[in-house]
């Protein structure tokens, strides 16, 4: 197969594209220079317009032929993050290269087009043409640039390419067309008799002489918009945009998102499609704009049509519900304006704020499908709802004092003592006098009290069985934090974001100062951080207006480890021993949704957000997980673990994680998980092909998964705990298509408990991880752990276990020994000697507990990871010393005994706890560095993933990341889902989906 020249190649290529001849909205673009003469022949044969696609490679400084990305017209920029990180290209260097290539882009654009601008791509079928494909780097960038400029469908067409070119290009284009793809391929020019270089003048002539057919005066198009486009004011936005452009037609919601029929001049329709994405409302997230020509309906105006609901799974995926968001500034301004009819209305909302996920009972998102359906609009609200010029045009939860809902204050006997604004005033008086009030918000009830009233805080801890566990606070404004915490710019941004999460802020050390506030100590105890959030519901702002305090304890309305209470009757019974009064309203909460918790960490890769609990403000937004090599994953339901339970549904590129559900050991949490499974399946319309569970045979989540799978008639796949942890991070970074089981990444999974295939408890693991398999190549040497849960609740037991394994005497001068009775010591000694009632564990979490107990930090805990949290808080930032782990033995076991012996020596020598803590943290980080290097020698990979609950420790995560980056590794930590068990279900779903898609039996339950 040899072409005479580029014109001959273009004509033969056009024969492969005849189905696009005379099709509206087809545009041909050639890649300068050599691709343009080929594209000219294609454009003329298809009767389509011709333009150039200007793309410039961004070369690595000093290695210009190595592409670290590309730029295109319209501000399109594509970066290969892996190349940038591996070659340590700085932001300044990227900008310098981009500036040089941008200048060349402008020069070429002016030379090729003259006074004409680029042809609009939005909504078009774009055929990208080159004279051949070798590496595909430029073609790939051109396709991505076309997508970013709004192309509805991208076709990559070349005369000749290597035989495996479609696999190389992956998902860059929607279609691939080629005249020939020989196995013996050396260079494009080998397939042309005449392959003379194309000049700039020839490109200009091709563009000048290749004019497409005259555009019709009007056209009709159907536009499908996908993403978070319901409940965010998208239909009013579309109505306003279409009207401003003189278009006619309609817009409506359906099961898949928003559907638009629009008619008007083609240029206006092009602009309309582009602006749908570029100017979407603030709460919207547009993932796709799909355009196709249709027959005119003869519409004369542009209207909002009634929503359409279908049966069964939508072909293109279910519409995405938006999460609940904080009240916006416009609504706050109205709420405190005495002249406004919504003055002090506790349920004020608009298209840009308020509850969504928690009040929606189904899709499409319309008032009739929300818990606001029971509240009939008053004439004034109805007029606003139907007025295109009003900011509450089609705002589904709109309400006022006349239409409801209504606040009321209730006492323990169920008596209503005040309503409306009087209920707010009465609640303020109770809080000012030290009472604990259960306040119903957006996602459930909170228990609130004055954080500056130490007696009230102590009483709340006692009633809630909270022990020393830190309590979150809600502050009236950021000024309240003066002298308590000094949030940086990123932390302030997180506090003020529309999600309004609880942000963990490092406390300022003001010990011993007379002006030191007392409340941080009472709410946070010995933790180094305090959890802070700002008011996000209108009722919160009303409570602070006139309240005697500017900081309230704001903790979930539940008993420890149970889900947050949402039902009013349940609130009186389940919170009856906790609260003195209830400030509630009559708007039902369909789905419970606890507050999200995040930490901002700027020293590690990513945008700095480390999710600790992903719930209100983020749920139910899907996580884009990309594709697994060569295909999309099947529908999977994953049940997560028993602690911090979250369930997950995946289909294609998307994963939907539920809100935080609690610990399944509590019956109410187990029931909440059952409900969440059904709600998530109904919301996403996914019909799972397989159910994923944790490999632990005794987990309640596994039992639930088996029950659901049996009811659906689908198989169950059990996934090893730490494999799931690492893969969850790979999924959120969309790295699944860059690895396989023969080319794994290095996964470091540190946590407290995870069931190992050998029946022991794992938790200090170094793994080689692919989508289907994880190979254990390193781990802490196992030590015997006595007593199951008792060892978790008493770090002293972990310390005694590690002392025994290290051959250290149980010296009574050690705090862990002194805290244990002689009888218990004798019992434990017998258990160790006879290997009775102990389980071997390689848990890093238990090693942290052991060191905390040895250092005298904590011998018993009131909440999970308390000892490790306080050990981290005690760390001395000025200490530069370190303990040292030995290298792994031939089986990959890493003995902690030398570290334990060094800790004992330091403690008995009177070394301060902070020094011991820092030396231990540094030892663990150095061990991770050494093990990563050892694992990298087994497989050629630069990627290390850090996952598991231990990496919530920001000190350790930062130390590990810095050491690994210095060694040239590409380090990935969690940024979208929690590193703890709250992210486990995502990893389970991906592993099970990969196994199921491959027909594998591995891990089947």
Please annotate each region the language model reported.
Residues 1-218:
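PRPP-associated nucleotide enzymes
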Residues 47-80, 293, 436, 444-509:
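A phosphate-binding glycine/aspartate-rich beta-alpha loop in the early core of alpha/beta enzymes
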Residues 51, 157-159, 175-186, 694, ...:
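Conserved phosphate-binding/catalytic loops in two-lobed NTP-binding clefts
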Residues 101, 401, 465, 469-553:
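Ligand-binding beta-strand-loop-alpha-helix segment within the catalytic cores
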Residues 186, 722-735, 745-750, 755-756, ...:
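Glycine-rich phosphate-binding/hydrolytic loop that grips phosphoryl groups
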Residues 214-408:
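Intrinsically disordered, low-complexity, mixed-charge
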Residues 279, 368, 384, 547-629, ...:
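Internal gly/pro-rich beta-alpha loop/helix module
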Residues 397, 404-406, 641-671, 675-676, ...:
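A contiguous, well-structured pocket-lining segment that forms one wall/lid of small-molecule binding clefts
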């Amino acid at each position: 197969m040899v072409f005479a020249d580029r014109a001959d190649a273009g004509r033969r290529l056009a024969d492969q594209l005849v189905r696009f001849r005379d099709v509206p909205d087809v545009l041909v673009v050639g890649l300068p220079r050599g691709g343009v003469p080929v594209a000219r022949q294609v454009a003329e044969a298809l009767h389509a317009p011709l333009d150039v696609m200007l793309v410039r490679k961004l070369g690595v400084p000093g290695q210009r032929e190595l592409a670290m990305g590309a730029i295109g017209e319209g501000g399109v920029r594509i970066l290969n993050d892996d190349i940038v990180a591996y070659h340590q290209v700085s932001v300044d260097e990227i900008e310098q290269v981009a500036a040089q290539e941008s200048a060349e882009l402008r020069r070429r654009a002016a030379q090729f087009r003259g006074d004409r601008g680029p042809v609009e791509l939005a909504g078009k079928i774009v055929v990208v043409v080159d004279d051949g494909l070798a590496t595909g780097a430029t073609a790939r960038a051109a396709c991505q640039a076309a997508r970013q400029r709004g192309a509805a469908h991208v076709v990559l067409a070349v005369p000749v390419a290597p035989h495996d070119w479609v696999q190389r290009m992956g998902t860059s284009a929607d279609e691939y067309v080629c005249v020939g793809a020989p196995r013996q391929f050396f260079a494009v020019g080998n397939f042309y008799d005449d392959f003379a270089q194309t000049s700039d003048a020839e490109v200009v002539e091709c563009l000048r002489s290749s004019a497409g057919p005259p555009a019709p005066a009007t056209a009709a198009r159907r536009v499908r918009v996908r993403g978070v486009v319901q409940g965010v004011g998208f239909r009013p936005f579309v109505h306003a945009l279409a009207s401003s452009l003189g278009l006619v037609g309609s817009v409506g919601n359906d099961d898949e998102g928003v559907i638009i029929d629009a008619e008007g001049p083609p240029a206006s329709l092009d602009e309309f499609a582009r602006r749908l994405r570029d100017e979407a409302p603030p709460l919207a997230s547009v993932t796709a704009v799909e355009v196709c020509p249709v027959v005119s309906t003869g519409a004369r105006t542009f209207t909002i049509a009634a929503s359409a609901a279908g049966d069964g799974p939508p072909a293109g995926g279910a519409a995405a519900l938006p999460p609940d968001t904080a009240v916006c500034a416009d609504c706050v301004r109205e709420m405190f304006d005495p002249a406004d009819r919504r003055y002090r209305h506790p349920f004020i909302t608009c298209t840009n704020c308020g509850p969504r996920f928690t009040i929606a009972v189904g899709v499409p998102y319309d008032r009739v499908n929300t818990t606001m359906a029971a509240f009939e609009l008053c004439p004034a609200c109805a007029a606003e709802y139907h007025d295109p010029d009003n900011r509450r045009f089609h705002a589904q939860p709109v309400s006022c004092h006349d239409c409801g809902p209504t606040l009321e204050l209730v006492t323990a006997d169920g008596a209503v003592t005040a309503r409306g604004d009087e209920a707010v005033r009465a609640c303020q008086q109770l809080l000012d006098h030290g009472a604990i009030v259960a306040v119903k918000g957006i996602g459930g009830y909170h228990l609130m009290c004055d954080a500056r009233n130490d007696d009230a805080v102590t009483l709340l801890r006692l009633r809630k069985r909270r022990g020393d566990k830190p309590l979150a606070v809600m502050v009236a404004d950021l000024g309240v934090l003066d002298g308590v915490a000094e949030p940086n710019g990123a932390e302030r941004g997180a506090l003020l974001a529309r999600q309004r999460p609880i942000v963990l802020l490092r406390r300022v050390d003001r010990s011993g100062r007379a002006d030191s506030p007392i409340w941080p100590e009472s709410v946070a105890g010995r933790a180094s951080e305090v959890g802070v959030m700002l008011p996000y519901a209108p009722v919160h702002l009303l409570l602070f207006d006139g309240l005697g305090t500017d900081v309230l304890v704001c903790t979930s309305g539940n008993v420890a480890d149970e889900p947050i209470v949402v039902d009013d009757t349940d609130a009186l019974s389940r919170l009856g021993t906790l609260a003195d009064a209830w400030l509630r309203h009559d708007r039902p909460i369909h789905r419970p949704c606890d507050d999200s918790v995040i930490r901002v960490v700027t020293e590690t890769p990513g945008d700095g957000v480390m999710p600790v609990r992903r719930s209100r403000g983020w749920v139910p937004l899907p996580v884009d997980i990309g594709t697994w090599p060569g295909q999309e994953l099947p529908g999977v339901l994953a049940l997560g673990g028993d602690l911090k339970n979250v369930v997950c549904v995946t289909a294609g590129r998307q994963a939907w994680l539920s809100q935080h559900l609690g610990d399944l050991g509590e019956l109410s949490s187990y029931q909440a998980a059952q409900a969440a499974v059904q709600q998530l399946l109904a919301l996403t319309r996914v019909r799972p092909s397989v159910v994923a569970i944790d490999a632990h045979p005794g987990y309640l989540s596994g039992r639930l998964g088996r029950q659901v799978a049996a009811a659906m008639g689908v198989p169950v796949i059990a996934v090893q705990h730490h494999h799931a942890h690492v893969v969850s991070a790979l999924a959120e970074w969309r790295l699944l298509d860059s690895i396989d089981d023969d080319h794994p990444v290095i996964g470091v999974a540190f946590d407290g408990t995870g069931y190992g295939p050998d029946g022991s408890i794992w938790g200090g693991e170094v793994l080689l991880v692919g989508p289907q398999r994880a190979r254990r190549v390193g781990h802490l040497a196992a030590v015997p752990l006595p007593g199951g849960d008792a060892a978790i609740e008493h770090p002293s037991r972990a310390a005694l276990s590690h002392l025994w394994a290290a051959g250290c005497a149980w010296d009574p001068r050690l705090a862990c020994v002194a805290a244990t009775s002689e009888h218990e010591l004798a019992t434990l000694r017998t258990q160790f000697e006879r290997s009775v009632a102990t389980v071997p564990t390689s848990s890093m979490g238990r090693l942290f507990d052991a060191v905390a107990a040895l250092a005298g930090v904590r011998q018993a805990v009131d909440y999970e990871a308390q000892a490790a949290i306080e050990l981290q808080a005690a760390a001395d930032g000025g200490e530069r010393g370190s303990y040292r782990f030995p290298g792994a033995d031939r089986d990959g076991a890493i003995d902690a005994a030398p570290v334990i012996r060094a800790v004992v020596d330091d403690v008995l020598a009177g070394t301060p706890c902070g020094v011991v803590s820092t030396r231990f943290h540094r030892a663990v980080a150095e061990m991770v560095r050494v093990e990563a290097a050892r694992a990298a020698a087994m497989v050629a990979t630069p990627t290390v993933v850090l996952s598991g609950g231990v990496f919530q420790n920001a000190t350790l995560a930062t130390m590990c990341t810095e050491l690994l980056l210095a060694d040239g590794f590409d380090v990935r930590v969690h940024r979208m889902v929690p590193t703890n068990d709250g992210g486990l279900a995502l990893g389970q779903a991906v592993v099970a989906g990969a196994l199921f898609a491959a027909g594998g039996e591995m891990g089947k339950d």
